[in-house]
Amino acid sequence: MTEKLIRKVWIAVSAAILWGCGDASSYTAVDGVMLGTTLHITADVQGVSAQELYAAAMELDREAKASMSIFDPGSLLSRLNRNETDSVYRHIAFNLHLADSIGALSGGRYDVTVKPLVEAWGFAGRQAERHPDVDSILAFVGREKVRVEEGRLVKADPRVQLDFNSIAKGYTVDLLARLVESFGARNYIVDIGGEVRCKGGNRQGGPWRIGIETPFDGNMSDGEYVQKRIRLTDGGLATSGNYRRFYLDADGNKVAHTIDPRTGRSAVSRLLSVTVAAPTCAEADALGTMFLAMGADDALKAVRTMPDVKVYFILADEADGYEEYISPAMEAMIMQ
């Protein structure tokens, strides 16, 4: 089936679970908070209560934040960024390895050394600088400026800082899925803040259904508007967009949280939403950020050279409407 741009739609950005599974009495369901956002688990775990499953998830939550959080000053990543340690343990090592793989596809648009730029633009817990000195900051941004040698992080410049926010949530979803499987689950869906990993199907034997929301700039409602439904039986899915984390600068220009590390500036284009399905949620998470940072034209060119990549883009058109792009590999997963 050939790729195509199809009818105009409203913006669809974040992924939400559609729990239309019928009677799920044989499944254990957990709802809570993880990584500071929503947590949902539905799984046919064996011999474990919802309370025990949630407690195990909270232990993983503490482990993930202690390693990869840029907001926790005591995390390993924060201490690496402040040059208080150079030790690289497994979570950091995995994130760096995946970042290198995605970065190689990105033409320089995906780079986890962007933290100083993210801070300057006000998206890492600091107030935005009125006129960030982008050129000066770019002098110590670049994946080539940091390497790992025998389990130690070596920086070419001590000002280099890492930010794994484009991977860490998806990676934690994958860790949570592994945890659920350790409790005997053969069918499950886990969701942290709209990033999803699933296996098998619902109690009736059908696929899990993931809803792609139809929000708009500033919309904070989860799951109220659904543009597309995607069937998923194995793997990860993540949706990236710039409709929640943005602000208008003094000149009225939109400044979004996705930063192009080549220019040091916000990557705002007519590409409004990117949904990626991949074998792991970490891959889907990182690829979504990569495509957003590329912008509409380059993202469309890139994905057309990747026949196995499963993506769903929503783009603004010139008439204040919207268009969809569904890659050939994704088409069979679209339910409507």
Regions found by a protein language model. Name each.
Residues T2-W10, W19-Q336:
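Mature catalytic core of soluble alpha/beta enzymes
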